């Protein structure tokens, strides 16, 4: 059994004296584990850092075996990612989300969004938007997709500013007004890719919304808590935006 693909390194752990078990999010084969012989060598360690874009070949005698990776660099991002808290927490958060998915299930859309996130860590607001969309996609891939395109009460497709915490469906301003305190906020950029978040508050409200549904449908049923990297990422984004506005 063998294949070749491109991927992004998510994590590495030692295996024996010289090898490493490497976790890669691949384009066509999902999140995949494999052993890299000599993975702890000085030559290989810089390559096997989270965030690096790699060419990966996998081989195993049987499909159910972990198998062996041969990994070659396509582009190095890890050194840049450890320079800022936004990037460091961001790649950790993306990896934590991907670990909610079954291993080896292909999710090309998530892979492509992961690549975009890594490319935009130098713009905290853009990185926040992309990771927010990543969480919306995660809910969809896990079977708990949100319906944000039209009002659950009226069918209107404009002025959608709320989300029902019960149904995960959008609600327009007029229909939601009597129950506004019980509804989740829906910033306009979330369901319109032509729009951008205008400030940190937009991101904070959007992440509160996705966090509610991740907790309800994913973390609590699995007896898990939100990863620390999530709050770390949001705090880092907030600080970075405040600093840029002050300068």
UniProtKB/Swiss-Prot annotation:
Spell out the GO cellular component terms annotated for this protein, sorted alphabetically and separated by semicolons.
bacterial nucleoid
Q: Which HAMAP family match?
A: RecO (MF_00201)
UniProt keyword annotations, A-Z: DNA damage, DNA recombination, DNA repair
Name of protein: DNA repair protein RecO
Q: Repeat: present as a keyword of the record? A: no
Its biological purpose: Involved in DNA repair and RecF pathway recombination.
Report which superkingdom the organism of origin falls in: Bacteria
Biological process (GO) annotations held by this record are: DNA recombination; double-strand break repair
Q: Which family does it belong to?
A: Belongs to the RecO family.
InterPro entries on file: ARFGAP/RecO (IPR037278), DNA_rep/recomb_RecO_N (IPR022572), NA-bd_OB-fold (IPR012340), RecO (IPR003717), RecO_C (IPR042242)
